[in-house]
Amino acid sequence: MPHDAPEHSHTGISPSGHPYRADQDAPLSYFQNMEIAMRELLSEKGIATEAEINAEIDRMDSRSPADGARLVARFWVDPAFRERVRADASAASREMGFDIGALRLIAVENTENVHNVIVCTLCSCYPRNLLGFPPDWYKQRAYRSRVVKTPRSVLREFGLDLPGDVQVRVHDSTADMRYIVIPARPTGTADLNETALAALVTRDSMIGVARAQSPA
């Protein structure tokens, strides 16, 4: 069919070398149909308007690893807050204004001798309220099954080769209990403020497959 778009390849690969996203032409799934039916029912019953539902979706979509990074940075610089996170990470998160819902959040701290990594072996439970949407690899069966059995091997695939004397602990998230890794504070950051420290904290470091970045 003729069109006026610029010349492009039909190999499925973009000029930058990345594959084009597949067309979403398949019929709606069971869960998609259920979502539509639920939205209509909530509206018909006067429980929530379409605008309220969309606002909540926008609020959830706006969450990102930057929220978790702020919590980690404050953990590093504020001894009193650090103890509150250790005692009740859910309450400490709410203290910073993060709405994490009713779930129980547990912070696991990396040290010189212990490295933590999180997974959900059953599905893809993830601290979305602090980190946003999980990466695709976190949801894949390969990661979920292998990181429990051979965590060091999986971490090496992410470029993280831990010394043999460092203990690796794998934490399995559930529907009502989530984990966040507090990465070890990088050396050479004693003079950095909380905002600068938060910029060093990555999503992967809060999952446990990477370290926090070193200052430039």
Regions found by a protein language model. Name each.
Residues 2-216:
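Terminal, compositionally biased segments used for targeting/anchoring and flexible tails
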